[in-house]
Design a protein with these regions (language model features):
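A hydrophobic alpha-helical transmembrane-helix feature that marks the membrane cores
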Residues: 1-246
Length: 246
């Protein structure tokens, strides 16, 4: 999604101090947008997951497995990510931000089942562990002098493999495959957190001289989306190991 728009290259070069100040503001917007998205997801998932009436809309009353609406809710976030990437050039910054928050709400709907499957305490504890791990990895990605841009292709291939294996295991129902996917997925999205943080930082440093505020605003939203997805996946994979079943 890094190539979602064409950046103007004309402009007056900014002094390092201006870049540092602008970068801090840019990263604050990225993390702020991501945090609001997390709150939206948490609110929707809690509201649906703790309401038997709402939860019953998305699962079979006898088997408790997802019904048609449940499957749609589960796959909707994945479809929306691809749609977001394809539409970002045509969206305004305000439109992109609205799309992101709608996506966060749909994501909350897709993971609402965790409140019926795991205890509230274990969900909270897993969220705390994920937050600490995410913050540490993102900080390392931001501050490291090591160029980790080469990780990108490998990690994207890993994500594609995870998606394929997860879909296959929906039909196989293999605990061994589910365990392997959780371990590998956790490692991949942990690495993506550091990688995406450095990428977001470098994109700003390389293109901030263009002074295109619309581009910077959309870049911050796309950065927030990337980090949000990493956080959600780390949380869901960790929940498989740390969550206590109801």
């Amino acid at each position: 999604m890094a190539d979602y728009q064409t950046v103007r290259t004309q402009g007056v070069a900014q002094p390092p101090a201006a870049i540092d100040e602008g970068l801090r503001a840019h990263m604050s917007k990225v993390y702020g947008t991501m945090s609001v998205g997390m709150l939206v997801t948490a609110g929707v998932s809690w509201a649906v997951g703790t309401s038997p009436a709402l939860l019953s809309i998305f699962r079979d009353p006898v088997t408790l497995s997802p019904n048609i609406l449940g499957w749609i809710a589960m796959f909707a976030p994945l479809i929306m990510v691809f749609a977001f990437g394809a539409a970002i050039n045509r969206l305004s910054a305000a439109g992109a931000q609205t799309f992101f928050y709608v996506f966060a709400a749909v994501m909350g709907l897709s993971i609402a089942w965790i409140f019926a499957a795991f205890t509230g305490l274990s969900i909270a504890q897993t969220f705390l562990v994920t937050s600490i791990a995410f913050a540490s990895l993102s900080l390392w990605g931001y501050t490291t002098k090591k160029d980790i841009s080469g990780w990108g292709s490998f990690l994207i291939m890993g994500v594609v493999g995870l998606i394929v294996e997860s879909i296959i295991n929906i039909f196989l129902g293999s605990p061994a495959i589910a365990f392997a996917v959780s371990i590998i997925g956790l490692l991949i999205f942990a690495a993506l957190t550091a990688y995406d943080t450095q990428r977001i930082k470098n994109e700003y440093v390389q293109h901030s001289h263009a002074m295109d505020q619309e581009w910077l605003d959309k870049s911050a939203i796309m950065g927030a989306l990337s980090l949000y997805i990493n956080f959600i996946n780390m949380f869901m994979f960790l929940l498989q190991f740390l969550g206590n079943r109801e």
